């Protein structure tokens, strides 16, 4: 299995931002130079990037179609993107705009039957399921929903198994406790997922801070790692990460 580094940009109100543990009230802004940053990813040798529409994640209705098209055409990057994907029409529109893969998050937890139907319709390589998880006191990986204020009935293990059996290829999993914290990814979580469903191509997300974290994700047999804050704040050089 090849290993992919996904430099990431989260967009809100046209600006590159990062949220601390997904909290919209704890936002750091990094400027509105989205296209130049994407070009810099390509110039460093990246083949993929991860693009998130934070406005849509909150309100629904993906808003980055025009920007996505620009990035795809001008940089040659393959873009994995999502935020507010709630209908079949959303998926089709984002793919038509130039996405290589569409990320489905909240709906994948709320209505797995519908999303499994999309896998069959659009192809298992065109969707990435994103699951945000938090470990409870009993050690069970739960799936917080509705802005992480409630917990879904299904657990991470149950949904990951269900999607794997339905033919899902790409699973992006974020440990909420590590998101934006630069405290290192929770490699125990990813080892657990790899053992649970070895056929899944698991992407590491949340907490990556240095080359050792990238190397650990690769050594664990994960398919890739999403790098956000560490790149934006200069803790990690993209060329070095790509060469890892």
Curated annotation (Swiss-Prot):
Q: Which InterPro entries match?
A: Aldolase_TIM, His_biosynth, HisA_bact_arch, Isoase_HisA-like, Isoase_HisA-like_bact, RibuloseP-bd_barrel
Q: What Pfam families does this protein map onto? A: His_biosynth
Principal location listed in the UniProt entry: cytoplasm
Which top-level enzyme class is recorded in the Swiss-Prot or TrEMBL entry?
A: isomerase
Q: Which UniProt keywords apply?
A: Amino-acid biosynthesis, Cytoplasm, Histidine biosynthesis, Isomerase
- Cell compartments where the protein resides: Cytoplasm
Give any GO molecular function from the UniProt entry.
1-(5-phosphoribosyl)-5-[(5-phosphoribosylamino)methylideneamino]imidazole-4-carboxamide isomerase activity
Q: What is this protein called?
A: 1-(5-phosphoribosyl)-5-[(5-phosphoribosylamino)methylideneamino] imidazole-4-carboxamide isomerase
Organism whose genome encodes this protein? Xanthomonas campestris pv. campestris (strain B100)
């Amino acid at each position: 299995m090849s290993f992919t580094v996904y430099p990431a940009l989260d967009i809100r109100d046209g600006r590159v931002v990062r949220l601390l543990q997904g909290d919209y009230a704890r936002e750091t802004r990094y400027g509105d130079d989205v296209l130049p940053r994407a070009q810099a990813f390509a110039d460093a040798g990246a083949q993929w990037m991860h693009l998130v529409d934070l406005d849509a994640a909150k309100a629904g209705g993906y808003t980055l179609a025009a920007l996505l098209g620009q990035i795809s055409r001008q940089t040659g990057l393959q873009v994995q993107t999502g935020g507010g994907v709630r209908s079949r029409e959303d998926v089709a529109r984002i793919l038509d705009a130039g996405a290589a893969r569409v990320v489905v998050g909240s709906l994948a937890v709320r209505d797995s039957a519908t999303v499994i139907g999309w896998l069959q319709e659009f192809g298992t390589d065109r969707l990435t399921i994103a699951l945000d998880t938090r470990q409870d006191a009993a050690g069970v990986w739960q799936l917080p929903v509705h802005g992480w204020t409630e917990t879904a009935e299904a657990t991470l293990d149950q949904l990951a198994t269900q999607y794997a059996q339905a033919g899902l290829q790409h699973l992006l999993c974020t440990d909420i406790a590590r998101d934006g914290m630069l405290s290192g990814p929770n490699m125990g979580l990813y080892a657990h997922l790899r053992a649970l469903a070895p056929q899944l191509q698991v992407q590491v997300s949340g907490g990556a801070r240095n080359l050792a974290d990238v190397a650990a994700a690769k050594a664990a047999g994960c398919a890739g790692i999403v790098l956000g804050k560490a790149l934006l704040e200069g803790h990690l050089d993209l060329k070095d990460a790509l060469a890892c």
